[in-house]
Curated annotation (Swiss-Prot):
Alphabetized PANTHER family for the sequence: MAGNESIUM-PROTOPORPHYRIN IX MONOMETHYL ESTER [OXIDATIVE] CYCLASE, CHLOROPLASTIC
Family per record: Belongs to the AcsF family.
Phylogenetic placement of the source organism: Bacteria, Bacillati, Cyanobacteriota, Cyanophyceae, Synechococcales
Pfam families: Rubrerythrin (PF02915)
Annotated protein name in UniProt: Magnesium-protoporphyrin IX monomethyl ester [oxidative] cyclase
Function: Catalyzes the formation of the isocyclic ring in chlorophyll biosynthesis. Mediates the cyclase reaction, which results in the formation of divinylprotochlorophyllide (Pchlide) characteristic of all chlorophylls from magnesium-protoporphyrin IX 13-monomethyl ester (MgPMME).
Pathway: Porphyrin-containing compound metabolism; chlorophyll biosynthesis (light-independent)
Top-level enzyme category: oxidoreductase
CDD domains reported in the protein's UniProt record: ACSF (cd01047)
Gene Ontology BP terms: light-independent chlorophyll biosynthetic process; photosynthesis
InterPro entries associated with the record: AcsF, Ferritin-like_SF, Rr_diiron-bd_dom
Length: 358
């Protein structure tokens, strides 16, 4: 008999504190940016909309939402060990992602407070939301006798520098794709409550509205900086970030498909729905979006998944490191080629793709 209270077999820094996941191209990253450029940013082209969104943030609709209920007590004990393992990985990635947003938004609000108070307050209130989400997720991990040391993460994670425009693209997509991920899971579990393996999923409906509001903020901010969404160069960058976000999510989720199976979802179908909806939403602000219905779009991503499986198999061998590198090279090159071909597929002009919204 398997002990249902047994902790998932995951690496720990010390008893009860989970070691951070090994950094790969698929794991959440921590970001920093040009704070001086953010402080100087002129918001006048879209200031009215930004002030309206600030009022939404001040209202703090979810102030009393993230309160644990008695339903959480003992809920982890009902999971089988394999489901526990993939679920803890989901909690960790989600917590790390939310905490990454908190750190970026908090530092932005602190650095620009005296020179760009409107922008600073928006970032401060978004940091409040992200901290709330990260804390709720980390508390859920404690039900499995594990937690993340967020202070350790702050001090030891590598920070990736993105200039402000890249931060806007990446965080807009992160927030909007987060909305579609959470609401899709929530609606599925409403129809199939037998797959609700843990009470946290009941919180996803209100939770995703925070993500949606944050995405709306970056939508408004990009419209206040017209160069980010107008012109040839902006189109190239929008395509790049759409592809990077969609490909990363699809490859990562298919590789951890057991988590979605535990929820009664097919990882591929779920991701295709989320990608289609996020692509459609992005047409409200991006000048172009991807042709995700192109017959080769998912075929090429599946090739990347097959390549990654080969890379993992090579890494698991006892061959010397130089030999591993040589064996891996064709698969790395193939991944690069697949993504380049996807990037070169003719995009959809947003004003044609979604004229009613535009």
């Amino acid at each position: 008999m398997v002990d249902s209270l047994q902790k998932p077999e995951l690496e720990e820094l010390r008893p009860g504190i989970k070691a951070p996941a090994k950094e790969t191209i698929l794991t959440p990253r921590f970001y920093t940016t040009d704070f001086e450029a953010m402080a100087k940013m002129d918001l006048s082209p879209n200031e009215d909309e930004l002030r309206a969104i600030l009022e939404e943030f001040r209202a703090d609709y979810n102030r009393k939402h993230f309160v644990r209920t008695p339903e959480f007590d003992g809920s982890a004990a009902d999971m089988d060990p394999e489901t526990k393992k993939v679920f803890v990985e989901f909690l960790e990635q989600s917590c790390t992602s939310e905490f990454s947003g908190f750190l970026l938004y908090k530092e932005l609000s602190r650095r620009i407070k005296n020179r760009n108070p409107l922008l600073a307050e928006c970032f401060e209130l978004m940091a409040r939301d992200e901290a709330r989400h990260a804390g709720f997720l980390n508390k859920s991990m404690s039900d499995f006798d594990l937690q993340l040391d967020l202070g350790f993460l702050t001090a030891n994670k590598k920070y990736t520098y993105f200039k402000p425009a890249y931060i806007f693209y990446a965080t807009y997509l992160s927030e909007k794709i987060g909305y579609w991920r959470y609401i899709t899971i929530f609606r599925h579990l409403e129809q199939h409550p037998e797959y609700r393996i843990y009470p946290i999923f009941k919180f996803f409906e209100n939770w995703c509205q925070d993500e949606n509001r944050h995405g709306d903020f970056f939508d408004a901010l990009m419209k206040a900086q017209p160069s980010t969404v107008r012109g040839f160069v902006a189109k190239l960058w929008c395509r790049f970030f759409l592809l990077a976000v969609f490909a990363t999510m699809y490859i990562r989720d298919v590789q951890r498909k057991e988590f979605y199976e535990a929820l009664g979802l097919d990882a591929r179908e779920y991701d295709r729905h989320v990608i289609a909806k996020t692509n459609e939403t992005s047409a409200r602000v991006f000048p172009v979006v991807l042709d995700v219905d192109h017959p080769k779009f998912y075929d090429r991503l599946e090739t990347c998944i097959a390549n990654n499986n080969q890379l993992a198999a090579i890494e698991a061998t006892s061959a010397p490191k130089p030999v591993k590198v040589l064996r891996k090279l064709p698969y790395y090159l193939s991944n690069g080629l697949q993504l380049l071909k996807l990037y070169l597929v003719k995009p959809l002009e947003s004003d044609v793709y979604q004229p009613a919204v535009r």
